[in-house]
């Protein structure tokens, strides 16, 4: 770098970079998805007054996904780049090169190709039954449910074999486009073409056909991860739940109060599998875990005036832990056999204790004004920790260990007695408190224009953490957000214009790129959308013609790295227009 200038946060604001290179990383995606679902059910009424109701339901789904995403990376000639970061949503990066010219002199030095495919299979099965005694306003309900979900992810990688054909000359160790390469440097330009965004792209059909891609893709061996970041492995989860619930209605000070309370008991059994490579030997490891929770809840609504309702509710909810942190991913390379790294199948779920208090004032028709105060107290966050476990619980075959590792275990009493310190994700003791306010106003304007109306919604969130191992904030939660909708609905026609706004928000944990304080942040953003429909009432089943326009003003999505002027990425999703017809038969 020449003449580099920094601001007070050490963010580069200007510089000249000599001996710089651009690179193209082109990656076409091809996905094939299959899915089926069946969901039978029935409702049965019993009793002399038909006030005993039995609802039964079953469900089953299965889906398959196959994704291929070959990568081609080529580099430009060395050049001098002028960098300016002096305002705006992105820095200015200029050079004398025409980056949309396939004949610029693009080459393989520093380049690569990848064959990285992914297959996923998901299967679910479930059944539930609910038995209600009494009418809908006053009753007791009991029920049970069973759910099974199984997901398998498999990554495949044949990059080295493809590189041997494309640019290593069938025998080299470096991708340099030398003699014997299917696409040598001299021919590379003919496999490139101008791109739609002012930067070259690849002629994928020719490139893949001339480099034996399809045969190598089909022969790709399984790898421990996919290029999407997902780890190879599977998880099977079985949930069994029981609940009892009561609904009641009574007069309190001559005002109607509606009450709902219940408790749910849930048990979860998980079986987690994944590949483990120890000293060059690859095997599949199976880990089991289970947990159970009791989840109470209640809701009270009281008509304190003719058009005013006050509400109070509380509940305890459960969110499953991250499956990727529970996969084995065992590494046991310590010569002394004292330490290892591994996923933790025994991670406990996130638990949230929730309290909401608020009310609504009904102004007539569909109109009302509402205000709610809410609090969520969340536990179950994870941090890196150490678990000391018996060697036999590590899931590693003793016969695959090196002699020096077997000797280390023997010095500590042998494989049946020795313990191992495992670095893994563990549940932290801290708590994250999320408190907030939500206000809503829905108002028909029929007196001004028949069918016209609007709705406004505003939410403010404040977050505080207590104890160790808890993030300062929950990622992806904006401190302020609001949306407004203007609508017109009349007979067969309707149209809605909506605007949504989110404040700046944190979207990642700390320690990004090894910088302790660095987080990724999303810029504040507003988006305008429209939806409209018209029902063809004179046709059978009254089909609707629909029009949906998303992101009318073409707003971009921008994220920054720690500081507002350090652009991390800028994504322009564009404007989406969908015209369709919807009906039943």
Describe the role of every protein-language-model region:
Residues 48-56, 136-140, 255-259, 306-308, ...:
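Outer-envelope beta-barrel architecture signal
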Residues 3-20, 82-111, 165-231, 388-427:
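Flexible glycine-rich, low-complexity coil/linker segments exposed to the extracellular/periplasmic environment
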Residues 375-377, 382-387, 394-511, 582:
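Gram-negative outer-membrane beta-barrel transporters
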Residues 19-26, 108-115, 178-179, 187-192, ...:
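Extracytoplasmic loops and strand-loop junctions of Gram-negative outer membrane beta-barrel proteins
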């Amino acid at each position: 770098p020449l003449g580099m200038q920094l601001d007070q946060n050490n963010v580069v604001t200007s510089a000249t970079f000599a001996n710089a290179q651009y690179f193209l990383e082109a990656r076409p995606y091809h996905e094939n998805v299959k899915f089926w679902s069946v969901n039978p059910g029935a409702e049965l009424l019993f009793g002399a007054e038909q006030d005993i109701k039995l609802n039964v339901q079953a469900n089953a789904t299965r889906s398959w996904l196959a994704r291929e995403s070959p990568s081609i990376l080529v580099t430009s000639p060395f050049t001098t780049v002028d960098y300016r970061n002096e305002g705006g949503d992105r820095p200015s990066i200029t050079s004398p090169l025409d980056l949309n010219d396939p004949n610029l002199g693009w080459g393989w030095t520093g380049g690569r190709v990848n064959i990285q495919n992914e297959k996923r299979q998901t299967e679910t099965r479930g059944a539930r039954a609910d038995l209600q005694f009494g009418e809908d306003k006053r009753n007791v309900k009991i029920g049970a449910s069973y759910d099974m979900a199984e997901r398998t992810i498999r990554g495949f990688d044949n990059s080295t074999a493809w590189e041997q054909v494309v640019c290593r000359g069938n025998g080299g160790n470096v991708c340099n486009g030398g003699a014997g390469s299917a696409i040598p440097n001299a021919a590379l330009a003919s496999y490139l073409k101008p791109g739609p965004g002012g930067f070259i792209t690849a002629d994928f059909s020719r490139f893949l056909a001339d480099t034996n891609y399809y045969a190598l893709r089909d022969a790709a061996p399984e790898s421990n991860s996919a290029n999407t970041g997902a780890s190879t492995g599977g998880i099977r989860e079985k949930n069994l739940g029981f609940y009892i619930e009561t609904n009641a209605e009574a007069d309190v000070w001559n005002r109607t109060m509606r009450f709902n309370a219940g408790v749910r008991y849930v048990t979860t059994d998980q079986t987690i599998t994944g590949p483990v490579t120890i000293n060059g030997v690859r095997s599949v490891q199976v880990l089991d875990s289970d947990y159970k929770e009791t989840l109470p809840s209640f809701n009270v609504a009281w008509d304190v005036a003719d058009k005013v309702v006050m509400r109070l509710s509380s509940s305890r909810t459960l969110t499953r832990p991250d499956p990727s942190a529970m996969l084995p991913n065992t590494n046991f390379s310590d010569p002394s056999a004292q330490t290892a790294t591994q996923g933790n199948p025994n991670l406990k779920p996130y638990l949230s204790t929730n309290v909401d208090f608020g009310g609504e004032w009904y102004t007539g028709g569909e109109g009302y004004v509402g205000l709610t105060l809410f609090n969520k107290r969340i536990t179950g966050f994870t941090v890196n920790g150490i678990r000391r476990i018996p060697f036999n619980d590590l899931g590693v075959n003793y016969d695959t260990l090196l002699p020096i590792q077997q000797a280390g275990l023997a010095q500590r009493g042998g494989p049946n007695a020795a313990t191992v310190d495992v670095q893994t994700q563990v549940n932290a003791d801290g708590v994250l408190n999320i408190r907030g306010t939500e206000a809503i106003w829905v108002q028909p304007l029929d007196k001004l224009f028949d069918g016209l109306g609007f709705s406004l919604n505003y939410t403010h969130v404040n977050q505080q953490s207590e104890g160790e191992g808890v993030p300062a904030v929950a990622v992806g939660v904006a401190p302020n957000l609001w949306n407004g909708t203007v609508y017109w609905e009349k007979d067969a026609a309707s149209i809605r214009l909506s605007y949504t706004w989110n404040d700046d928000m944190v979207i990642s944990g700390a320690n990004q790129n090894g910088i302790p304080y660095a987080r990724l942040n999303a810029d504040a953003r507003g988006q305008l959308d429209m939806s409209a429909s018209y029902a063809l009432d004179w046709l059978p089943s009254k089909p609707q013609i629909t029009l949906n326009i998303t992101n009318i003003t073409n707003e971009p999505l921008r994220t920054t790295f720690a500081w507002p002027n350090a652009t991390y990425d800028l994504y322009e999703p564009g404007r989406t227009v969908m015209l369709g017809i919807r009906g039943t038969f």
